[in-house]
Amino acid sequence: MELVKICPEIGIVMDVDTGIVAEMRKDILVVDLNPIKEEINKLETLSKAFENSLDPRSAPLKAYDGRDNIYSVGGLFQSAFFGFWISLSILTLGLILVIGLYPKLIGL
């Protein structure tokens, strides 16, 4: 929304979008809401993508075609990764415990 001051002395302005000529009042603040609407639309798009990310069958917002089950595949790899490291650490702790309790097993 753009305003053109026709006569600043008496406060007459014209709205460029509609072509309406009117008197500008001192007690009313005119604010352009178009940039705010654009930011709200961006936030709505991002929130919709975040909501869709909770469904493992959906694709991410900026993904290539054919990436429909990417979240479920990522979940499988994440589970395998953490499962490997957790089981390796439990095995190492168990081995240290067995060696500590029975040092004759390794010849000490």
From Swiss-Prot:
Transmembrane segments: 81-101
Localization of this protein: Cell membrane
Enzyme class: translocase
Presence of keyword Hydrolase: no
UniProt GO BP: methanogenesis, from carbon dioxide; methylation; one-carbon metabolic process
Gene Ontology cellular component annotations, sorted alphabetically: plasma membrane
Pathway: One-carbon metabolism; methanogenesis from CO(2); methyl-coenzyme M from 5,10-methylene-5,6,7,8-tetrahydromethanopterin: step 2/2
Example GO molecular function: tetrahydromethanopterin S-methyltransferase activity
Entry-linked InterPro entries: MtrB_MeTrfase (IPR008690)
Keyword DNA-binding: no
Reaction catalysed by this enzyme: 5-methyl-5,6,7,8-tetrahydromethanopterin + coenzyme M + 2 Na(+)(in) = 5,6,7,8-tetrahydromethanopterin + methyl-coenzyme M + 2 Na(+)(out)
UniProt keyword list: Cell membrane, Membrane, Methanogenesis, Methyltransferase, One-carbon metabolism, Transferase, Translocase, Transmembrane, Transmembrane helix
Assembly and binders: The complex is composed of 8 subunits; MtrA, MtrB, MtrC, MtrD, MtrE, MtrF, MtrG and MtrH.
Family: Belongs to the MtrB family.
Protein name from the UniProt record: Tetrahydromethanopterin S-methyltransferase subunit B
Organism expressing this protein natively: Methanococcus aeolicus (strain ATCC BAA-1280 / DSM 17508 / OCM 812 / Nankai-3)
Species classification: Archaea, Methanobacteriati, Methanobacteriota, Methanomada group, Methanococci
Gene: mtrB
